[in-house]
Amino acid sequence: MQLFDSWAGYLNERDYREFVLPYSQEILASVDIPRIHFGVGTGELLQAMSEAGSEVMGVDYRVAMDTAAQRVNSRVLQGNLDPALLFAGDDAVRQAVRTIRGEVERAQQRGDIDTHIWNLGHGVLPTTDAEAITRAVSIIHEEG
């Protein structure tokens, strides 16, 4: 189950901890299945968000994976390919995949995380060509 918080990134950490974190903890504690916690624009909130109780922290495309890994209590990160890159062509996607892979490898070498799950660093944009998604998955399998 993924708890997807599109608005958390508008808050500072103090307000997040007071007005959002207790409810995120309650929601995540109410389900007995693997949980992912993701927020948009939440690079500075990742530490607080990782206290909500999920097994996986989703990372949006605005923060490098190795930086995110230093901010969380999670051993598993998910993300963080920029969904706009699906409009930029295969070469741009391939370069981004290589960059993200390098960031993940650095985080793993430091012992910050164990595992990475590939995903977009936010939702699929409405006008994205489905074939671009298929090609991105193929590139991830080749490069990632």
Task: Kindly give the residue locations of the regions a language model identified.
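Active-site loop segments of alpha/beta catalytic cores
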Residues: M1-G144
